[in-house]
Amino acid sequence: MTKTAAVILAAGQGTRMKSALPKVLHPLAGRPMVAHLIHALGAVAPSRTVVVIGPGMESVADRVAPLPTVLQAERLGTAHAVAQAGEALAGFDGTVLILYGDTPLITPETLTRMVEARLAAEDPAVVVLGFRPADPLQYGRLITSPAGLEAIVEYKDATAEQRAIGLCNSGVMAVDGRVLFALLAAVGNDNAKGEYYLTDIVALARGMGRACAVVEGAAEELLGVNSRSELAAAEAVIQGRLREKAMEGGATLTAPETVFFSADTRLGRDVSIGPFVTFGPGVEIGDGVEIKGFCHIEGARVAAKATLGPYARLRPGATIAEGAHVGNFVEIKNSAVEQGAKVNHLTYIGDARVGARANIGAGTITCNYDGFGKYHTDIGEGAFIGSNTALVAPVSIGAGAIIGAGSTIARDVEADALALTRGPHEVRPGWAAKFRAHMRRLTGKN
């Protein structure tokens, strides 16, 4: 088995984000940027992964746990950052991937190609991931020859001829673990910033007589996120991928550009998704589900052939069983709607069970919170809840029971019973006309 390790550089302050949240924790498709890299690394199954963080970034350490983190106490450059992983990678003699926490769009396929290139017959010491950006102005150039990669030249130091080269440095590398830390130890800081640049290891490796190589990746994979606008650009890229994946997997998206997925959204076959639907993290949708427009779903499971929306909201803990209906302006939280049940209009179901084939009338509310605790409502199989009903939890409605419209139910109702609490119907003929006449005399108004 190929031995692989990874170092993720995540110590950057991210000042351009203007945020209290560390840059690498900003979410893309419902997942922190750094977590996208960790997920992509699964393709090469690293035996060790180390995340380099800066001072005050304990939240990053918490998020990447159980992966180990090492501290770059002073931000002295990328080579210095990688060197902080020396103890964690002591004795490792395989391929070390070096990634950046703010470059989250690299695909598993590209990482696999990087490792394969490192293990080629030429035995390159360093493999650099290059790309061809539409605007290459700011990037270092990769200087190649028939023998492979010769050097990386920063733009400010490049000649006019070198600046004309379109192949640019992404910073991502795969390095022979047997020489990585020796190369890093040889890097100097004789430059304008007084920093230790990781790019210098290419020339150092060539000076040792070792080959270096380039793998070319798509420019969109190497989009770095340093600002809110770049975060939005990265979101657009990943949403495009997720939409394509959904359609290739057998889902129909009526207006793909209006549907937003989380990275972990799971869709069955023949799912139909209308416009302006948003999937938060933790959603699983079964085969043949219809999701109409303007639904918002997070932390929920929906079984086969259920129908949602339009304008339905499923919150964490919602489970919708096969063939159930959740209609317009319905919110369901931490509740089970069982097989064939219908919750079709203007309803809140929270901390509840809606039994199979039960029917919940428009305007029904489960009153689950008293300001201190949440309480459960249980609605039995085949029960019928009339419109504009308040179910004051904790309360149980038996199977087959009928609740009259407009009721407030605060006590349990046995199976097959009728319960209603509204006052008796009263009609007073002519009363309205007499009232208006009386008020006109009092006010002098017509």
Curated annotation (Swiss-Prot):
PROSITE patterns: HEXAPEP_TRANSFERASES (PS00101). One of its GO terms (molecular function) is magnesium ion binding. InterPro entries: Bifunctional_GlmU (IPR005882), GlmU-like (IPR050065), GlmU_C_LbH (IPR038009), Hexapep (IPR001451), Hexapep_transf_CS (IPR018357), MobA-like_NTP_Trfase (IPR025877), Nucleotide-diphossugar_trans (IPR029044), Trimer_LpxA-like_sf (IPR011004). Its cofactor is Mg(2+). Its EC number is 2.7.7.23, 2.3.1.157. The active site is at 345 (proton acceptor). One of its GO terms (cellular component) is cytoplasm. UDP-N-acetyl-alpha-D-glucosamine binds at residues 9-12, 23, 72, 77-78, 100-102, 140, 154, 169, 226, 315, 333, 348, 359. The keyword Cell wall biogenesis/degradation applies. Residues 250-446 are annotated as: N-acetyltransferase. One of its GO terms (biological process) is peptidoglycan biosynthetic process. Acetyl-CoA binds at residues 362, 368-369, 387, 405, 422. Its main location: cytoplasm. Pathway: Nucleotide-sugar biosynthesis; UDP-N-acetyl-alpha-D-glucosamine biosynthesis; N-acetyl-alpha-D-glucosamine 1-phosphate from alpha-D-glucosamine 6-phosphate (route II): step 2/2; Nucleotide-sugar biosynthesis; UDP-N-acetyl-alpha-D-glucosamine biosynthesis; UDP-N-acetyl-alpha-D-glucosamine from N-acetyl-alpha-D-glucosamine 1-phosphate: step 1/1; Bacterial outer membrane biogenesis; LPS lipid A biosynthesis. Residues 1-228 are annotated as: Pyrophosphorylase. It catalyses: alpha-D-glucosamine 1-phosphate + acetyl-CoA = N-acetyl-alpha-D-glucosamine 1-phosphate + CoA + H(+); N-acetyl-alpha-D-glucosamine 1-phosphate + UTP + H(+) = UDP-N-acetyl-alpha-D-glucosamine + diphosphate. Residues 229-249 are annotated as: Linker. It holds the Pfam family Hexapep. Mg(2+) binds at residues 102, 226. Binds 1 Mg(2+) ion per subunit. It is found in: Cytoplasm. In the N-terminal section; belongs to the N-acetylglucosamine-1-phosphate uridyltransferase family. In the C-terminal section; belongs to the transferase hexapeptide repeat family. NCBIfam families: glmU, PRK14353.1. Homotrimer. Catalyzes the last two sequential reactions in the de novo biosynthetic pathway for UDP-N-acetylglucosamine (UDP-GlcNAc). The C-terminal domain catalyzes the transfer of acetyl group from acetyl coenzyme A to glucosamine-1-phosphate (GlcN-1-P) to produce N-acetylglucosamine-1-phosphate (GlcNAc-1-P), which is converted into UDP-GlcNAc by the transfer of uridine 5-monophosphate (from uridine 5-triphosphate), a reaction catalyzed by the N-terminal domain. This is Bifunctional protein GlmU. It comes from Rhodospirillum rubrum (strain ATCC 11170 / ATH 1.1.1 / DSM 467 / LMG 4362 / NCIMB 8255 / S1).
